[in-house]
Amino acid sequence: MKKHFPLTSTRLLAATTAFAAAALVAACGGGGGSSTGSGTPPVDPAGAPVTIFDRTTAPSKLSAWHFVLSDGAKLTLNDGVVPYDLNTALFSDYAFKLRALYVPAGKQIGYKTDGTLDFPIGSAIMKTFYYPTATGTDAAYTGVARANQTVQGSSIDLSAYRLIETRVLVRQPDGTWTGLPYVWDADQKDATLKIGGASVALELVGGGGANEKFAYGVPNAQTCEKCHSTETSGGAGILPIGPKARNMNKSYAYDAATTKNQLVALDDLKLLSGFTGIATAPVNADWRDTTQTLEARAKAYLDSNCAHCHNPGGNASQSGLMLDYATVGTTTTPSKWGVCKKPLAYGGPGAPYRYGIEPGQADVSLLLYRMQHTATADVMPAVGRHVNHTEANAMIGDWINSLTLAACL
């Protein structure tokens, strides 16, 4: 079974007019224009509308959905597919990500100040993973550049970037979500469904570190559920992780001349219901923004990279370690976020590593230790990371060293 929804070019045209008339807002986290492309997402040249499939009829090719179009030289979003970004995102081996959402005509996303926004039936969220191209040292590995993403926009220039995969989350008629991974073909013109996941040999080049070869992992359905079953009371289904008000309350450079707060943009597009304005909207820090406090940056990073499992309804709830935004930094029960907390199951390297966080002692804190290692027994997050996020680890270390809570006994 599949459903066709009409193109929504009139909504985007109206939004573009509104964008041009509005005062530009400075982009959070250094978006500063679009290096990946420009302009309002174009209509698919074939005139094909976005097509939503149910879980039993998912197509083998990404192009069948008409979310994106690639001619091998440039990837663009179809009409009605809206790009977005997050203040602080999940680290995925330095991959860049073009996030986008689609809402059926006449439907709206329910605004919430806490938790994932409420997407209507027939909605889709897609995330394309890609890297800046680079010259590696081994023909068996694709060379890609090590960098932290700053580019935004509505398209990807494939002369400068290499597509790896696109993940699609679709809200089904029964209200549940289905996740599907598509791996981009060698010619970069389409992507193929890989239900069982896949491995892509990559070599990170430059960025202040030694070249690093690794197997980039495209998740299978079971792996997807490990993270996306968060906040569902025991994994009774999966949910999107990123699209929360506090993550999306930031500016986005839709093209070189148009930058606007994303929540306001969705509201202007008539895609958001119940929105009360950015003055009352929660906001996460950008972990890279050194004008923010270390605590705000650390809370945002742990919330985006750890809390999908380390929350009361997540897969790591049994650990007793809660790393969600509301919990980290509280002084009433700091053990909940790891302070002087011994691990329940993780054996670890032994002394002097005793606690998740030892205030003022990042070098012996297990939280940072696990973020600095990639061995299966040690790595955290347990899914989606094969290399270390050196810059973020340094920030987390600085935060732990800044803590002035009582020393652990």
Which ranges hold each PLM region?
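Extended surface/linker regions that mediate inter-domain or inter-protein docking
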Residues: N87-S92, F96-A300
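Bacterial N-terminal signal peptides that target proteins for export
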Residues: K2-T17
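Bacterial Sec-dependent N-terminal signal peptides
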Residues: A22-T51, L409
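The −1 position to Zn-ligating cysteines in a subset of zinc-ribbon hairpins
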Residues: T223, N305, V379
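Electron-transfer interface patches adjacent to heme c in soluble/periplasmic c-type cytochromes
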Residues: K250-K299, H308-G314, G320-L409
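Secreted/processed peptides and extracellular or luminal domains of membrane proteins
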Residues: S34, T230-S233, P312-N315, Y346
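N-terminal pre-domain segments of enzymes
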Residues: G37-A100
